[in-house]
């Protein structure tokens, strides 16, 4: 049968209508998708989503003043990235209840600001002064991952001598970690600030220095129980609650989780094929084999005690980082500070045993420090007659290696 002209016209009309309909439907679907994406971007992000927005106006203003702030006030680095569920379990805090006031410290990657947070401690608690950590503009994906690791890590800790994470703002960029504010800054700067001229009364007594060591040791006991290896115990990575040296309410906490590595660059050494290493605080097995354990943390704590007694001297004075590496590998050790009590010197020496298993536990160290702290010897150094106190008053004599 032949197809007539009207039949062909009808077929063409049907095909044209189908094509036109499909084209219109495609356009409608594309328009709907674009509209939905734009609408979705305007919505507040749901829990756990990370949405890039324009830079926080408040942060931008403070960053404009960053050049006037030095690095001396640095305060505030787990191997796997936290899961989405772990990120969502972090203590989220509304950005509109957080105000940033001034820059406290800045390194190559991170910044720490002082701010206030409304009702962050509890509903109705009012404004609390806080420290706020954020990444610098242009942070890499790796740095952002480390930032999330830090938040997840800190959220696990709950101890009077571990810096507390109060909340996070992760829904938008820039992301923030909200931490308790430690007004005394980092311990290294605090110790160095206590140095006085000859024949002037010390701002920190031996009892004060032992109390500082005890605070840190208590935090280490907790980390040991949590099976957490710090890897970078040092005075620069601890924080002090009070600026005043005579304050009875002073508390020292383990508080680094990153920025100090930016600030005190000279305390680190970049070994070929590895990241920055705090060689002056590292045990032989860490330097030789890259092994880090609670035993290597004990070694580092011994160095931290030495730092405390010398009011913040750099360990192994006069040696370069590479010289320190060879010195420790070959069995060399720090010399005892002048006039250091025998019990404290012996405890430091035990922390630096060549065999890691011969080093004491943090629980034992805490017990021993408490024993020394309350001993008649320590009391005589603190309150004794002029002859026993005189060496402590001449700090340039007492706080120097032999």
UniProtKB/Swiss-Prot annotation:
One of its GO terms (molecular function) is transmembrane receptor protein tyrosine kinase activity. The keyword Nuclease does not apply. Residues 98-377 form the Protein kinase domain. Keywords: ATP-binding, Kinase, Nucleotide-binding, Oncogene, Phosphoprotein, Transferase, Tyrosine-protein kinase. It comes from the Viruses. The modification Phosphotyrosine is found at residue 268. Disulfide bonds: none annotated. It holds the Pfam family PK_Tyr_Ser-Thr. Its EC number is 2.7.10.1. ATP binds at residues 104-112, 133. One of its GO terms (cellular component) is plasma membrane. CDD domains: PTKc_c-ros. The active site is at residue 232. SMART domains: TyrKc. It catalyses: L-tyrosyl-[protein] + ATP = O-phospho-L-tyrosyl-[protein] + ADP + H(+). This protein is synthesized as a Gag-Ros polyprotein. Belongs to the protein kinase superfamily. Tyr protein kinase family. Insulin receptor subfamily. This is Tyrosine-protein kinase transforming protein ros. It comes from UR2 avian sarcoma virus.
């Amino acid at each position: 049968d032949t197809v007539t002209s009207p039949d062909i016209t009808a077929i063409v009309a049907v095909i044209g209508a189908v094509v036109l309909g499909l084209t219109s439907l495609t356009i409608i679907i594309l328009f709907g998708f674009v509209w939905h994406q734009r609408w979705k971007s305007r919505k507040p992000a749901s829990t756990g989503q990370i949405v890039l927005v324009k830079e926080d106006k408040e942060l931008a203003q403070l960053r404009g003043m960053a050049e006037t702030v030095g690095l001396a006030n640095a305060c505030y680095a787990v191997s796997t990235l936290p899961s989405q569920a772990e990120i969502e379990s972090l203590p989220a805090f509304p950005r509109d209840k957080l105000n940033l006031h001034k820059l406290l410290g800045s390194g190559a990657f991170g910044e720490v600001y002082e701010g206030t947070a409304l009702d962050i401690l509890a509903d109705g608690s009012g404004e609390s002064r806080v420290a706020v950590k954020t990444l610098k503009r242009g942070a890499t994906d790796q740095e952002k991952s480390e930032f999330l690791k830090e938040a997840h890590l800190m959220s696990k800790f709950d101890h009077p001598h571990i810096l507390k994470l109060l909340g996070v703002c992760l829904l938008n960029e820039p992301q923030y970690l909200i931490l308790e504010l430690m007004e005394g800054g980092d311990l290294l700067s605090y110790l160095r600030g206590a140095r006085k001229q000859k024949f002037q009364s010390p701002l920190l007594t031996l009892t004060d220095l032992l109390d500082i060591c005890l605070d840190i040791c208590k935090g280490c006991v907790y980390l040991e129980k949590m099976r957490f290896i710090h890897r970078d115990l040092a005075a620069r990575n601890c924080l002090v609650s009070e600026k005043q040296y005579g304050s009875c309410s002073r508390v020292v906490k383990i508080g680094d989780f990153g920025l100090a590595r930016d600030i005190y660059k000279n305390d680190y050494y970049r070994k070929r094929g590895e990241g920055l290493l705090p060689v002056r605080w590292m045990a032989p097995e860490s330097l030789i084999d890259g092994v880090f354990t609670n035993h290597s943390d004990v070694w580092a704590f011994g160095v931290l005690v030495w730092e405390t007694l010398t009011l913040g001297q750099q360990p192994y004075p006069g040696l370069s980082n590479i010289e320190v590496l060879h010195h420790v590998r070959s069995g060399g050790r720090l010399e005892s500070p002048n006039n250091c009590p025998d019990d404290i010197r012996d405890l430091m020496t035990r922390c630096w045993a060549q065999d890691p298993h011969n080093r004491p536990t943090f629980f034992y160290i805490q017990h021993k420090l408490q024993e020394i702290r309350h001993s008649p010897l320590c009391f005589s150094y603190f309150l004794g007659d002029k002859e026993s106190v005189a060496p402590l008053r001449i700090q340039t004599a007492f706080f120097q290696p032999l």
